[in-house]
Amino acid sequence: MKKIFIMSIITMLSSLYSCQAQNKGYKSLSADDYEKAIADTAVIRLDVRTAEEFANGHIRCAINIDVLKSNFEQKAAATLPKSKTIAVNCRSGKRSKNAAAILTKNGYQVIELDSGFIGWQAAGKEIIKE
C-alpha cells in the first residue's frame, strides 16, 4: 500500500513538472539549434548579462540589456519590437530563462540559449570581443 501511495505521488509530481515545462511560453534551444535560429536576420539577439560580461565576449550582433537591473522591462519595451522573435542568452542559462519568462509575459515571441554563453563557447561558436 505504501509503495502504491509513493508511486502515485511521484507520478503526480512528474505530471505537474511536465505541464509546467510545456507551458513556459518560450523555447530553450541547444547551441546548434540557437545558431540556426539566429541565422535569420529578423531575429533580435539579446544578451541579458552585465555590461562587463558582455564586453568580455558576446554573440555577433547581440544587444545588451542587463536582466538584473530594475529597469529591464522598461528598456526591453523601449528597445525590442514585439513583431520580431527575441533570442535571449546569458552566461549559463539561468538569467536568460528569467528574461525569457518576463518577455513572454509581456507579449514577445522568445527563444533562449539553454546552456548560455558558456555552452556557446564550449560548442566552438563565434564570439565577438570589444
Predicted regions and their residues:
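Rhodanese-like catalytic fold shared by cysteine-dependent sulfurtransferases
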Residues: 2-5, 17-43, 52-85, 94-130
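Hydrophobic helical h-region of N-terminal Sec-dependent signal peptides
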Residues: 6-14
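Structural scaffold elements adjacent to functional motifs in cytosolic proteins
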Residues: 45-47
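Short, surface-exposed ligand- or partner-binding patches at beta-edge/loop junctions that are enriched
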Residues: 89
